[in-house]
Design a protein with these regions (language model features):
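Conserved beta-strand positions that form and line the central face of beta-propeller blades
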Residues: 82, 130, 143, 231-232, ...
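A generic secondary-structure signal for well-formed alpha-helical elements
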Residues: 42-45, 49, 87, 117-122, ...
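Long, internal low-complexity/basic segments
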Residues: 202, 207-216, 224, 232-422
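Active-site-proximal cap/lid insertion segments
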Residues: 1-105, 116-124, 186-189, 194, ...
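Non-transmembrane alpha-helical segments in soluble domains
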Residues: 28, 35, 39-42, 46, ...
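Polar, surface-exposed loop/tail segments
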Residues: 52-54, 98-162, 240-243, 247
Length: 422
């Protein structure tokens, strides 16, 4: 069997359709090209007699557009190839490490490691830890992964692993992996996965997974399930490991001052946002608690969430809306607070569009869809409205929202500017 075909056969986390096979084969061919390209540089080092004085790092970034690859916190999106070669005269800097290792490292560790190899102590403010050299740190127990903006869709996720077990938390659980962005959906595999599912031609258990509403939390045993398909969150045998990794994730947010829960527009400031917040003495704890609440929110939290809707802080209002949306998406409430209707008339398009989602789910779709389909003075729909309309197309009762008038309005806007389909 040809090597590419054999490797594609092993991709159990994606449906077996020709376009996905083609995308994977194309990626593997590119990997072979890179291998030859790296060989040219190594040969050049030898020709210049620099090879015995050069420490070589070889690694990739997080990939291109393969389905469930870059942009997702599954291992297929975060686990990259990484090789370090130390010539014999510098091998003592490996401190006895050789061959393959299961040691956990991440890209923040690269700069401290290079400093350590040069005999320079990494400064304490660096988040990463050196894994080679004079100032090598003790191996880490945990490695973390972050999903921030996914093109036009804001859907933050975080993950933590100890190498064996993996915990993922999705802070906006009602959003789907199948929400498109122009970068990844430029590949045939993603497009045809959509067409296969929406056309009712699914033949694979993994085919519907990206179209289902997210579980708020996921837990995987990577030794038994390296493709992260079997979510073990409800397995009593995993309860202690889940508690441990959930606690580590909560600690990570606070230790790093994670800014990913501020909206994109808030982070586009001339002065770095972290400096602004530091000078204000910002209360991160309230924000993190609100974001973490979304995975376990119940109607008992509604009075507090309604209070948060009146906060002067945009990010607090936004995360209050997210929690109320989650209550609506999981059928825990039949109506939203009356303050939601007022959000549609505010100058906060991110919050207004998000609020329209829960209004659709709780019997107020007419006014919500009127807002979402109202074009601006330039005749275009803003990106926040478009992303929420896309999310609503995946709702179980989407047909009741996209009536004839709504469809005609959306088609007219898109026809006037086809770029808005992304």
């Amino acid at each position: 069997m040809p090597p590419f075909r054999r490797q594609v056969d092993d991709e159990r986390h994606v449906p077996d359709i020709p376009e996905i096979r083609s995308d994977f084969a194309f990626h593997m061919e590119g990997s072979q090209d890179i291998d030859a390209w790296v060989g040219m540089f190594l040969d050049d080092l030898r020709r210049q007699r620099l090879d015995e004085n050069t420490i070589v790092f070889f690694f990739s970034d997080h990939g291109g557009c393969l389905p469930r690859g870059k942009g997702f916190v599954y291992e297929t999106g975060t686990h990259v190839p990484f090789i370090v070669y130390l010539p014999p005269k510098w091998r003592h800097l490996a401190n006895g490490q050789s061959g393959r290792t299961d040691r956990l490292i991440g890209f923040p560790d690269l700069a401290p490691t290079v400093l350590s190899l040069a005999g320079i102590e990494p400064p304490a403010y660096m988040q990463g830890k050196a894994f080679l050299g004079e100032y090598e740190a003790a191996p880490k127990r945990y490695e973390f992964a972050v999903k921030a903006n996914q093109a036009s869709h804001y859907c933050p996720e975080r993950a933590v692993t100890d190498g064996r077990y993996k915990y993922i938390v999705r802070y906006i659980p009602y959003k789907h992996d199948a929400l498109m962005n122009a970068y990844q959906w430029g590949m045939p595999g993603n497009i045809c996965w959509d067409e296969t599912y929406l056309g009712g031609r699914c033949r694979s258990a993994v085919c519907p997974m990206t179209f289902e509403r997210h579980c708020a939390e996921l837990f995987f045993d990577l030794a038994e399930d390296p493709y992260e398909i079997d979510n073990r969150m409800d397995d009593p045998a995993c309860a202690e490991e889940i508690r441990r990794l959930r606690s580590e994730m909560s600690r990570f947010l606070r230790d790093t001052g994670d800014l990913g829960f501020f909206l994109k527009a808030q982070r586009l400031t001339p002065t770095p946002l972290c400096e602004i917040l530091r000078d204000e003495g910002y209360d991160y704890e309230r924000l993190y608690r609100l974001a973490e609440l979304s995975s376990k929110v119940t109607p008992e939290s509604l009075p507090y969430l309604t209070e948060c809707l009146a906060s002067p802080r945009k990010e607090i209002r936004y995360w209050a809306v997210v929690n109320i949306n989650q209550l609506a998406a999981t059928g825990q409430i039949a109506k939203v607070p009356e303050a939601f209707a007022g959000l549609l008339g505010t100058d906060d398009p991110e919050i207004a569009a998000e609020a329209a989602y829960a209004m659709c789910l709780t019997g107020r779709s007419e006014e919500a869809m009127a807002y979402l389909t109202a074009a601006g003075p330039n005749g275009r729909l803003d990106s926040h409205k478009l992303t929420m309309l896309e999310l609503l197309t995946l709702a179980p009762d989407a047909g009741s929202y996209f009536t004839g008038d709504v469809r005609r309005t959306v088609r007219a806007v898109v026809a006037a500017d086809p770029r808005q389909t992304a």
